[in-house]
Amino acid sequence: MIRYEIKKIFSKTICRISMIVLLLSLIISCYFAITNITYIDEQGVWHTGIAAARDLRTEKQKWEGTLDEEALQKVLDEYRKINEEYPIRQGDYTANMLHDSKVQGISEIKDMINIGFCEFRDFNYYRIDSVSKDEVGKLYENRVKSLEKWLGSEDAEGLFDENEKAFLLERYGQLKAPLYYEDYDGWRSVLHYAQTIVMLVM
């Protein structure tokens, strides 16, 4: 029965063409999902593809683990060491790529620190530069405080009632800390293109 249905599908030229187009679209979507991950080598050269994803994962796995105060301080030390040896120079593309190649292993943790010490709903790429080793351990506590401060500001006025504010603060306070870090670039790329791939398959 199944064999008959398959033969029926491929018996018409229009069906064969449609299947070829569908297959090509699926291959292209999978290709973009794979090449969406980039890795910068020690010479500051960009790479994409499976090998790049593997190399980037290797870099990030060095920092896999619980992000407690000690781990966050190590990230801060590493970032400052990189800044001293490979400083960002305005207009110097090569120097900046070398800097990024050294930072890519800790980039997500660095961004987490930036977000944790910025005002709520704000982001400052260089906020980490002014965070001290004593402060960085208060990352999780600080994100709750920043939400509380924002909810009491004029920016949030009229957006939430008191019950909703209390609910948001409660949910933020329930975050299981410290967080556990591991590389998720592969999953992020798959999820980014998952909708397109599922639509094509269906």
Language-model-derived ranges and their functions:
Residues 20-28, 198-201:
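Lipid-exposed faces of alpha-helical membrane segments in multi-pass integral membrane proteins
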Residues 121-201:
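Membrane-proximal, non-transmembrane alpha-helical segments
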Residues 6, 76, 148-151:
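Non-transmembrane alpha-helical segments in soluble domains
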Residues 26, 30-101:
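Juxtamembrane non-transmembrane segments of integral membrane proteins
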Residues 78-143:
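Extracytoplasmic loops/domains of multi-pass membrane proteins
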Residues 1-22:
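Aromatic- and glycine-rich beta-strand/loop motifs that create alpha-glucan
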